């Protein structure tokens, strides 16, 4: 089998012809290309219609846009948090590391207990998608659960990279969309810690402008937020949006939070290094080069695995 992570940007995933298609979620993104959510749903509908009848779509039916795309499809398997889903996670609990465990029901009946070694409720959903795929292919249930337990994550996805000199934990994450940001921060909140710091680098001017209000609403779980300059990637600064405007809107939305704009990476590292305390969590967040700040903060002897 060949497994690939497909991206919808520029309809690039429509060049694929998979036998199994997994829909984790559908959300407003890449609006510089799609313009609106209806166009995004049309592309996803085309994607699932390209899957042959002898194949299957495995999808999270708790997402309303996914449900829209799945309408009328017979060759589908669903997962989620309700017994109407084919696979349903119940009795979800988290340990002090934020690692979840849950009971997995299949078609309304208890199937197995799942324990993960990666944090966050979003990984409960991810694990159900992986489980459903392997189960469909005939893999033994015990093999699936053992494999899920052994999985410890991947680069730049809630990636523990080390500690600061005083003992704050440094985590790097690729999240650059409001939905991803909330999932990452929620995962961090489940870990035993003191203050939660986030160093956020917005990614592209078009995304920042199109989802401005959503970004403003996304950081209610943090204690300290530092916003760096927007990472331009492929774009030019012609959209009348800035990190300073984000800072102002976020300060108004979250007056009880420590929120500030800082453009220089070295200054950010110096400030956080002086002010973050023992057992705090520091997340460098974004799809650009914000991870460099974590490297500045980290002591060499504490390098993460």
What do the PLM-derived regions correspond to, one by one?
Residues 1, 53-57, 258-259, 280:
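Short active-site oxyanion
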Residues 1-9, 170-176:
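Switch II (G3) loop of P-loop NTPases
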Residues 6-10, 63-64, 265-266, 288-289:
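Short beta->alpha connector loops
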Residues 7, 79-82, 93, 229, ...:
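Residues at the C-termini of beta-strands that transition into short coil/loop
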Residues 11-12, 30, 66, 233-234, ...:
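Short glycine-rich, flexible loops that bind phosphorylated cofactors or substrates
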Residues 12-19:
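Short glycine/proline-enriched loop/turn "hinge" motifs that connect secondary-structure elements
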Residues 20-170, 193, 247-248:
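Acidic, Mg2+-coordinating active-site environments of NTP-dependent enzymes
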Residues 45, 73-75, 109, 119-122, ...:
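ATP-dependent carboxylate-amine ligase
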